[in-house]
Design a protein with these regions (language model features):
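Sec-dependent N-terminal signal peptides of Gram-positive bacterial secreted proteins and lipoproteins
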Residues: 2-24
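Mature extracytoplasmic or otherwise solvent-exposed domains
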Residues: 23-146
Length: 146
């Protein structure tokens, strides 16, 4: 009887672990609105190194190896929501925002602001594989330029 109970208990733990892992990474999970069928995880971190410069570090992880994955566009805004400038990966000098044939991609983008003013960024992530694609939009926190 002890062996049967022990086996049932172990099976229950294994099933719980498998289900927890599957749901934690499940695309279109309401608990993780950043996830979809192509994008598993996104990160945006903002910093103010000095001289009015704002730096935004962006990262995106796909649900597997993607044909194309990265940042399709980044828009810099004043804290009041006024949009200042926007850059896409197809523009000259911004090709590094997109990666190809990989499962994740990271990039850092700088914006020249004015010391003492507060800014934030809106980052548009993109991933595609075959004929399908998905996108996620994220805002950074507001930061004051130094």
């Amino acid at each position: 009887m002890k062996k049967i109970l022990k086996s049932c208990f172990i099976c229950l733990i294994v099933i719980t672990i498998i289900n927890t892992t599957a749901f934690a990474a499940a695309p279109n999970d309401p608990a993780n609105p950043q996830a979809n069928s192509y994008i598993l995880k996104t990160t945006v971190a903002v910093g103010a190194p000095g001289n009015g410069v704002i730096e935004v570090a962006c990262g995106v992880t796909g649900t597997g190896r993607m044909d194309k994955i990265g940042i399709s566009r980044i828009t810099f805004c004043k804290a009041d929501g006024t949009r200042l400038e926007s850059h896409g990966y197809t523009e000259s000098g911004y090709g590094y925002l997109m990666g190809y044939n990989k499962s994740n991609h990271n990039a850092v983008v700088q914006f020249q602001g004015v010391a003492g003013e507060s800014y934030y960024a809106i980052v548009y992530f993109y991933a595609s594989k075959g004929n399908g694609s998905g996108g996620v939009t994220m805002e950074s926190s507001v930061i004051k330029a130094k």
